């Protein structure tokens, strides 16, 4: 699928113009240009990316450990609930992308980030009070992960592309996406274990942590949208 997409979709007009102007062949290393000229863009991108890594690792990774160790659910049932949520998420990713094209990438991403941060509270509450019901456990994971997280994941790549000009876009997006990715992936599950031990098995501290990440990402996404709109207005073609 990736090969088909890559060979059938043309480069953007912006990139083709940069290539024709010789900007893509300049000798300055793109990573030097990005770090020197776009530090705020990098910070905003990393801030926006935070909820992606945090929320996924809490709901799709740590929740399995929580269900098995704290609620004594079988590992098979916990994995089944997460796999069901991941499968259900696919059409909602497409819907989120469509909504982002219509209403603005930053708006949809920011609202979805806030929804993720808020939904984690009832999600863990429902897991705690499920009584071992697979239906309730599946519901507790599927709604936040399949619907709200899809609103983050769907417009994410397009949102980050708004941060950098064509000549350094690939490098800029790589920094924004990969740097917080490997940090969060390694830290969040262990941090959640520590937080839940501190609170004697209660996931409230974890929910607060997710909410802080969500607020940070929402602020960053709304700021990216506002900056993009100002730049588009200055160019005479605002894109809401």
Each predicted region: which residue ranges?
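Multi-pass alpha-helical transporter architecture, strongest
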Residues: 2-7, 159, 211-240
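Flexible cytoplasmic inter-helical loops of multi-pass small-molecule transporters
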Residues: 7-30, 233-237
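Extracytoplasmic gate region of multi-pass secondary transporters
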Residues: 39-86, 184-189
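Helix-to-loop junctions at the C-terminal end of transmembrane segments
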Residues: 93-105
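Cytoplasmic membrane-interface "Motif A"-like loop-to-helix N-cap segments
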Residues: 102-114
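C-terminal ends and interior cores of transmembrane alpha-helices
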Residues: 114-131
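A late C-terminal transmembrane helix in Major Facilitator Superfamily
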Residues: 167-197
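A membrane-interface helix-boundary motif in multi-pass transporters
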Residues: 194-212
